[in-house]
Amino acid sequence: MASQGTKRSYEQMETGGERQNATEIRASVGRMVGGIGRFYIQMCTELKLSDYEGRLIQNSITIERMVLSAFDERRNKYLEEHPSAGKDPKKTGGPIYRRRDGKWMRELILYDKEEIRRIWRQANNGEDATAGLTHLMIWHSNLNDATYQRTRALVRTGMDPRMCSLMQGSTLPRRSGAAGAAVKGVGTMVMELIRMIKRGINDRNFWRGENGRRTKIAYERMCNILKGKFQTAAQRAMMDQVRESRNPGNAEIEDLIFLARSALILRGSVAHKSCLPACVYGLAVASGYDFEREGYSLVGIDPFRLLQNSQVFSLIRPNENPAHKSQLVWMACHSAAFEDLRVSSFIRGTRVVPRGQLSTRGVQIASNENMETMDSSTLELRSRYWAIRTRSGGNTNQQRASAGQISVQPTFSVQRNLPFERATIMAAFTGNTEGRTSDMRTEIIRMMESARPEDVSFQGRGVFELSDEKATNPIVPSFDMSNEGSYFFGDNAEEYDN
């Protein structure tokens, strides 16, 4: 990143801090996850959960969703102004699973949002601790990225389902702040912008008046976030055009879709963070670990270490494969849904299979599912090695344009080639290079054509033994060059429905 000087690291975004040195960052990230852990322990006490029940990932998700809902100002305000039948705007809750007489039971709980907010603040030294909330949102987003496909959403905005690797963070709420913006993929930003432009086309007042002025500011801010993800001058120049448009319309949508396609080869920089379920932080705090004193990082060895020593359980449906369920959660924990499977498999130490071959549905259990036949098993979340998370797209030759893979956005900073079907991608760029962005389009296509799939990304970067916390001895894996490793290959996952 050329502009590193002006950017805050993503731990700083995560903790809302100003520029800090490495030690301060580690301490404030530690304070953040420690607060999540303390909150979780307190909730388990409130709900009288046994140790086993407190380690159940479904219970963790319910508790996380409750605190996110309790702090969702906008939605709370909306619910109070538009009362709907059977929904108390002041309460929040969800399913809690308990072990009774050798069976799993579902119990629906309801809490005052005010009470949840009080417990959360108490766990976070009396502060609102927005960073911790964002952290939980990103964990949920990473879980969705690994679990669901967004084909429908892509098609609806006129994009190609093959662009799924650009959709990281597509289910993050609007209020996820700078840390949320950092982990959104190029496709996610493009989709948000297209939705906005379409509203403007259908509703003449969208850009007008006092509200319209605010809308326009939001539009420009989103354009700048997307521009910051691109690494080539031509892509950035095109984003300036889109942002400065007086009255955004179909021309801008065309430009954005063109840019999204180009990102399959000229990849954007998208941050990756290992965000773990609240119960994992809770377990560590309960065992006496002091996160703030020890310091913590979302992009180094710490999450791997934490998962090495945590035992988390999950409910398993009758015909699901527990190993596959573990893979799903492992990928979510490391934000690796869009990583090359060759790299993930090497780090994890067991083969990571494409989603089309997984015999498992999502982690959450719907309220109409039969609990009688539910079983539970231990999630295997340990890894053989650890690697540093990246925020670059892995473009080679001086971080300019390089081979993308039609479906990879690297998570780990580990040397590999990025095989891609240039023919498949370039086929999407026939025709339209006229209009005001013609010279930029031509330049982008030229860069894409000169990209070579055999180029090596992250030259010399490797994985590390779990005993090597200072990252002194990189082990550079060698991969079978021909074998491309997309997780979405032969995909049959369910769609994400809100």
From Swiss-Prot:
The keyword Secreted does not apply. This is Nucleoprotein. GO terms for cellular component: helical viral capsid; host cell; host cell nucleus; ribonucleoprotein complex; viral nucleocapsid. A motif (Unconventional nuclear localization signal) lies at residues 1-18. It comes from Influenza A virus (strain A/Duck/Hokkaido/8/1980 H3N8). Residues 1-21 are annotated as: Disordered. Late in virus-infected cells, may be cleaved from a 56-kDa protein to a 53-kDa protein by a cellular caspase. This cleavage might be a marker for the onset of apoptosis in infected cells or have a specific function in virus host interaction. InterPro entries: Flu_NP. GO terms for biological process: symbiont entry into host cell; viral penetration into host nucleus. Its main location: virion. The keyword Magnesium does not apply. Homomultimerizes to form the nucleocapsid. May bind host exportin-1/XPO1. Binds to viral genomic RNA. Protein-RNA contacts are mediated by a combination of electrostatic interactions between positively charged residues and the phosphate backbone and planar interactions between aromatic side chains and bases. Keywords: Capsid protein, Helical capsid protein, Host nucleus, Host-virus interaction, Ribonucleoprotein, RNA-binding, Viral nucleoprotein, Viral penetration into host nucleus, Virion, Virus entry into host cell. It is found in: Virion; Host nucleus. GO terms for molecular function: RNA binding; structural molecule activity.
